[in-house]
Amino acid sequence: LTYSCDLYVNVRIITYIYNQSENHIETKTKKLKDIYIGKLPVMVGSKACILSIIPHENILSECRYDMGGYFIVNGNEKVLINQDRIKENYVLIFKPANNIDIIHTEIRSMNEPLYLPTKTISLSMSKKSNHMGRVIRINTSFLKTEIPVFIMFRALNILSDYEIIHHILYDVNKLKNKHILEELKACCDDAIGVYTREDALEYILRNITGNMRNNKTVENVEMVLDSDLLPHITGRNKKALYLGFMINKAISIYLGYESYDNRDSYINKRIDTPGMLMSNLFRQCYGKITKELKSMIEKDINQWGNDSTSVVDLISDKQHITKYFKQGLLDSWLKYALSTGNWGIKTIGSFQNIKQGVSQVLNRMCHH
């Protein structure tokens, strides 16, 4: 027995049909309502629970002292344990755990209105120095290795050393900023040979992660910079200013003007309650469902070949599109997480992003 509710979605299908003879693109839009995609476990006593709409005195066969707040999965009562996490959209600087760097700056950036996964951007100052001093390099989720920060500035169309330094220091005449300026000389030298935006984009293109190699173009790099580099900030100049702020703060701590952040302090943390935990898990499940949906549609398109009309009719058919949403996938993933406490979806050969012990059996022991 699992206490759950059916989940239906409305699907909007936008089809672009290219007429080669007339060099014209025709757009068709169709809406399909109430497509079943799976079941969602319901928390007892929540707004989705039947008990929430029944007056308390009329509830039958339910203990009047039962406060709810648990899930029923495979006949077992499960509760979710609140989880803490590092807060998003805030620059934090810690003492590095390795012996390679002396400063580690990190921000977990998230576009909150869209509720997309966080993108981690980190800066590191190496213990090793070149002939000019210690360099600062940047790493992100779409790069396979660290790159010089000045190259990232030039990819954001901040080209000259003077412009970059202005984005970092704002006022060069301050005594503190003069000391920071001395530390930036090595960063200028680290980006030697890359002076234009085109060169910077090509440099990033050569260092982009493997899962983006199918779209390895300069245009794709520009799109990635807009969407994955500090996604909570819009506009390349604003992104460059924020990157400059991160560098300024990192060097200020290195020079002793500011102190390190405390990783264990709850000032720098946020708490995920059951609603947020279920939302994050559902987001992962839904992302995997859409990936499988995409691959199945591409398979049908390749199978039907040039018969575009048949493909459009096939995809737009309500009965057929229901087959794209494999029945039981969403149910099994959510039930597995609630049953085992392993929170997250396993990627191929990796449990890296899975938390353990999130779900536990409700203790009904009486202390009287």
Q: What is each model feature region?
A:
Residues 1-368:
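N-terminal non-catalytic structural scaffold regions of very large proteins
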